């Protein structure tokens, strides 16, 4: 102001300065910063809730973020553990790459999040607290619960994290190996992401005890009962904790875990498995591949075709176009009973024609009829019924074969019931007309 006080245009310049002060400077000097005061007794879970309520950016303050802040107060950088640094890969990267196929960008554990990892550690920590309380003579309700809830995570001490982090990571890596052995190679084929947490914790706790054939058989039974009983779909925290304790005890000679006892599988569920997002739907696909199903055209097992990234997906055995023309109801032909894993190339050959016609195409490329019959049987498809386009008989027989396959996996009978009434959940399969790649489905 003093610099321009004697100039001819002082008034104009002064007016501009006033405008700048009013419109810019005052916005800074008069800005009110909101402040929320929380008492020292406020629980960590309540802090998260308050943050989520007032945060207009939409960023959730999840358990990992709050635990990161808690550990930082003790000089420990949890984010570096998980995400890594320029100098080295973090735990997230190692899990994401675990058992990754050469043709894939990520492995079967790519869906494991930081909260999943903390949950597994929490199972060990709360188990230790419970055992310690038992040693002090406490019983019944006096004993703390083994738990992996959000509230428990927010009280996970740094010492417990340091104690179990490497053991739990090894458990997740063992879980990846376990899933690969079940022919579950990709995260999109994983029935339940939530079931990976107790699986990793169980394998971490058992260590080499999990390697015996008897132990592997029990863990597999537990896993498939969880999948086909559809017990990990929602509200899983209690089941995760129970399974961690009960499956380990079962492997070491105890009684059957509640997941194995609770699982109820009905035959009519096969008729309503139509959506690719269904855990049981994915489970049937994995069981078929695990029993050695071979591609109709190439005769390769699906461990090989997935390894070489040949776009394996689940497709109709009796093509949907043919079914529509024949007058078969969508609720019938769209179920998992009429679907099986096939490569995209084989599915293009199948197209929308009658099975007898596409089998002739396959054999026209040089495959012997008995070779093709063997491949069909590997999918639990009756060759004679498929060759005569007998949908009803083939459908009924394959339903029975799939029931037997599931019974073998879960180690107990499936409840036999009549097929249900129609519902509205269907899958479209555009690749029967034109291959769009498995990622388009």
PLM segments and residue spans:
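Intrinsically disordered, low-complexity N-proximal targeting/linker segments that flank membranes
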Residues: 227-314, 322
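A cross-family structural signal marking well-folded subdomains
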Residues: 65-67, 105-270
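Short conserved micro-motifs at the rims of enzyme active sites and ligand-binding pockets
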Residues: 44-48, 129-136, 210-211, 231-232, ...
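Acidic, carboxylate-rich catalytic segments that either coordinate divalent cations
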Residues: 230, 242, 383-441
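Short Cys/His-centered divalent metal-binding micro-motifs
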Residues: 335, 339-364
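Basic- and aromatic-enriched surface patches that contact anionic nucleotides/nucleic acids
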Residues: 1-128, 186-187, 225, 361, ...
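Conserved structured core elements
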Residues: 41-48, 60, 155, 162, ...
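Histidine-centered nuclease catalytic patch
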Residues: 305-338, 354
């Amino acid at each position: 102001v003093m610099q321009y006080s004697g100039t001819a245009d002082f008034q104009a310049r002064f007016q501009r300065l006033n405008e700048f002060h009013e419109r810019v400077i005052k916005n800074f000097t008069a800005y009110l910063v909101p402040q929320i005061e929380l008492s020292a007794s406020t629980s960590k879970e309540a802090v998260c809730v308050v943050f989520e309520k007032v945060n207009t950016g939409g960023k959730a303050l999840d358990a990992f973020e709050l635990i990161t802040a808690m550990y930082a107060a003790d000089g420990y950088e949890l984010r570096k553990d998980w995400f890594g640094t320029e100098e080295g890969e973090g735990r997230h990267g190692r899990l994401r790459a675990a058992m990754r196929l050469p043709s894939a960008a990520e492995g079967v554990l790519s869906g494991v999040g930081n909260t999943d990892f903390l949950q597994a550690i929490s199972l060990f920590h709360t188990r230790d607290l419970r055992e310690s309380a038992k040693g002090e003579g406490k019983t019944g309700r006096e004993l703390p619960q083994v738990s992996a809830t959000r509230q428990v995570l927010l009280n996970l001490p740094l010492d417990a994290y340091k104690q179990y982090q490497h053991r739990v990571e090894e458990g997740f890596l063992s879980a990846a190996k376990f899933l690969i052995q079940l022919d579950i190679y990709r995260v999109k084929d994983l029935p339940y992401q939530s079931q990976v947490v107790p699986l990793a914790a169980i394998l971490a706790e058992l260590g080499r005890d999990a390697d015996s054939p008897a132990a592997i058989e029990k863990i597999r039974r537990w896993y498939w009962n969880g999948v086909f009983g559809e017990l990990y779909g929602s509200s899983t925290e209690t089941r995760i904790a129970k399974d961690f304790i009960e499956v380990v005890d079962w492997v070491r000679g105890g009684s059957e875990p509640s997941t194995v006892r609770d699982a109820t599988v009905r035959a009519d569920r096969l008729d309503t498995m139509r959506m690719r997002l269904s855990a049981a739907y994915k489970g049937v696909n994995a069981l078929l591949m695990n029993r050695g199903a071979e591609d109709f055209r190439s005769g390769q097992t699906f461990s090989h075709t997935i390894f070489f990234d040949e776009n394996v997906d689940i497709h109709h055995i009796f093509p949907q176009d043919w079914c529509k023309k024949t007058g078969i109801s969508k609720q019938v032909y769209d179920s998992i009973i009429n679907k099986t894993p096939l490569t995209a190339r084989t599915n293009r050959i199948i197209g929308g024609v009658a099975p007898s016609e596409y089998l002739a195409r396959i054999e026209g490329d040089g495959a012997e009829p008995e070779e093709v019959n063997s491949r069909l049987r590997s999918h639990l498809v009756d060759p004679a019924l498929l060759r005569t386009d007998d949908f009803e008989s083939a459908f009924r027989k394959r339903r029975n074969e799939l029931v037997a396959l599931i019974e073998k996996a879960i180690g107990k009978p499936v409840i036999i019931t009549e097929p249900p009434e129609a519902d509205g959940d269907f899958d479209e399969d555009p690749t029967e007309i034109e291959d769009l790649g498995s990622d388009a489905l």
